[in-house]
Amino acid sequence: MKKKYFFFDIDATLTDDATHKIIPSAEWTLHELERNGHFVSIATGRAHYKTVAFTDPIGIRNLVCCGGACLVKDGVMLENVPLPIDTARALIRHAEEAGLGYIMMLDDSDKVFMKDFRFLEQAGRRTELTTYILDPDLNIEQIDAIYKIYIAMAREDEPNHPWVSMHGHLRMGSYLNYQYDAKKDGILRMMKLIGGPVEDVVVFGDAVNDLVMFDKRWTSIAMGNGMEELKQKADYVTGDNTADGVMRACQHFGWIDRDYYRL
């Protein structure tokens, strides 16, 4: 069997949205692929510390995380690229001039740093676990690495601030999330590191933010529960995540020949 190089999104691909836990047949499939000699990795926008909280318990040790900025091979972090520092500083200057609150992620943890309470006053607390560090003397000119920036801004106010588009970002309710967003580039860097041919890459995803890693050079598989835009770009559309879609796709292509329910 020819070796393939698998990269899986996490949320709603490997996991059940209702429980946020990995689907048993999907977890089994990851390890069955490894048993068959394939390379298995996660490809996610999650920060490294959040990704390993998911992957360590299930024993997956290869990661393309932080939206492609961070590469982990066999449990060892090889790189974690911050935002372009000049762009990051420019975004923060614009936010300050506009009177918009912001917080910054400066390391691989749930800590975010702020110089005042404007972000919390304008956007409220983030829905995920976050440790807020107040530092009134925070000076972006003295910070060399910024991994994420969150800027408080209502959706209807975006047209008034054209600078928001100077770097890719996600809308997260009442604020904008600026982060590295190049999972495909991360996959390509990983393939170069391990010396694998890119035509043997296989990616699984479900959401529009997975479009970036769907590439004509390799096999792109969309989950049945995925977005229509992603399905249209996919080489193959499998079943829903909760209907064993990951396992069924791997069986369909002959990458595994056993079945989780018939062991």
Feature map (PLM): residue ranges:
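Glycine-rich phosphate-binding loop signature in dinucleotide/nucleotide-binding domains
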Residues: M1, H38, R189-D200, F253-Y260
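Asp-based phosphoryl-transfer active-site loop
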Residues: K2-T19, F214
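Active-site phosphate-binding/coordination module
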Residues: A26-F119
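Hydrophobic packing residues within well-ordered alpha-helices of enzyme cores
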Residues: T51-T55, I187, F214, L230, ...
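Short, structured coil segments at secondary-structure junctions
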Residues: I58-G59, G67, H161-S165, K216-R217, ...
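Short hydrophobic/aromatic-enriched beta-strand-loop microsegments
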Residues: I60-G68, V81, G124, H169, ...
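Conserved acidic, metal-coordinating active-site core of Asp-based
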Residues: H94, A98-G101, M105-K216, N225
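Asp-based, Mg2+/Mn2+-dependent phosphohydrolase catalytic module
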Residues: K216, S220-A222, G226-L263
